[in-house]
Design a protein with these regions (language model features):
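Conserved Radical SAM active-site core
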Residues: 67-88, 92-167
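Flexible, acidic/Gly-rich N-terminal and inter-domain linker regions that tether
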Residues: 1-80
Length: 167
């Protein structure tokens, strides 16, 4: 049903819930069905480092499979930017980058990329206005998932971040 789909979408992309139980305008039966048939991506905050120079925050998040990814929040006068990881590890072999040391473990899903932004917004209580895809991994090596992430994060019914504010 279109109405139910809209409700679920809003819970996920506006309220950033991490459990179907939080979707209180859905019937208990529907929430139970959703729990049986779907998973919500949850990132566990393992560590946060805060720069004494400018307040930049680097988050280490654990994925459901135990892999770790990093995301960075940078605060500016014009708004908040989040640096998002696109892969666990990297296969590019750039000598200057530590992400490549253990090679590529796997690509992140669009939902795992999106959840980094949602998680930081939930932690800080502040809106993210810009996204930088310069975390762990090479986004063009995860092209299809990267494009899906861009469409989701720029959707007018969700975060509605302009594609011009995504680099």
């Amino acid at each position: 049903k279109k109405f139910r789909a809209k409700q679920i979408y809003e819970w996920m992309h506006i309220h950033h819930v991490t459990s179907f139980d939080e979707m209180t305008n859905l019937s208990k039966n529907l929430r139970e069905t959703l729990k049986e048939k779907a998973d919500l991506i949850v990132l566990e905050e393992e560590l946060v480092q805060i720069s004494k120079i400018d307040g930049t925050r680097k988050y280490l998040f654990a994925l459901a499979d135990g892999n770790m990814i990093e995301s960075v929040l940078m605060k500016y006068k014009h708004g908040n930017s989040v640096c998002v990881s696109s892969q666990v590890g990297c296969r590019m072999g750039c000598r200057f980058c530590a992400s490549t040391l253990d090679g590529l473990e796997r690509n992140l899903t669009p939902s795992e990329m999106l959840r980094q932004v949602y998680q930081i917004q939930k932690i800080t209580g502040e809106r993210v206005s810009n996204i930088v895809i310069m975390g762990t991994g090479e986004p063009l090596d995860n092209y299809d998932n990267f494009l899906k992430f861009i469409h989701m994060v720029s959707d007018e019914h969700g975060l509605n971040i302009s594609q011009r504010n995504i680099t």
